[in-house]
Every structure is written in structure tokens, then in C-alpha cells.
């Protein structure tokens, strides 16, 4: 739910410009449930999950195929995307880090970027109301 704001009530058409951010987290697939729970615990309800493959500094393993060695670079990852009000960002990042960390290479990355607008298609609500 939304916390009531102490300042006067603004009508639906007046954009109350609360800043929004998108958090993208690339994590190990087996950590997805833990991360989802952790985000839920800090009040994040909506998220998008995409299966991904990636490689960073983690070097792939080698496989033998028809007598030749190949390096398999891409490792399965999961990408989680969440759009939040600015004031929820730090809590969400902390939740993701705590839940996704194994202290091993390949734990993943988190990227934060500004969101200019959000619209709920069904109702036409915009901004924070659309999250």
C-alpha cells in the first residue's frame, strides 16, 4: 500500500513528482526465491524476472567436444527488475545483497537507473500510483 502523505491531497492529474528508480539485479538462479522473499519483506511487491545468460569476470569452464576443448562462457543467471520510489531504493538494494550473496565469484551485480515515467495500462494511473 501507499503511505499517506501529510501534505494536502493532490488530485490524480497533478503529477506529484516523486522520483522513481529501476533496480536491475543479475543473480544466481538458485537465489531467486530468497531474493524475492527479502524484497517482499521490505515492501516490494511487483517484480519482473527474466532468465538470462551472462559472463563477467567469472571465466567459463572448458568442455571437450569431438576431441577439441571449448570454453563455455555463458552461465545461467536470473535478472530481476523492480521499479520503486526513490525512498525505497536503499532498502531494496540491501535486501538483494543480503539475500544473493554467497561470497563466491559470480554472485552478480545490481544496476540502478532513473525512471522518467510509469503508466498502469488498465487504469491510466501514472507515476508512483502505477507501481
Regions picked out by a protein language model, each given a short descriptive name:
Residues 2-131:
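Positively charged, small/polar-rich N-terminal and surface patches that mediate targeting and assembly
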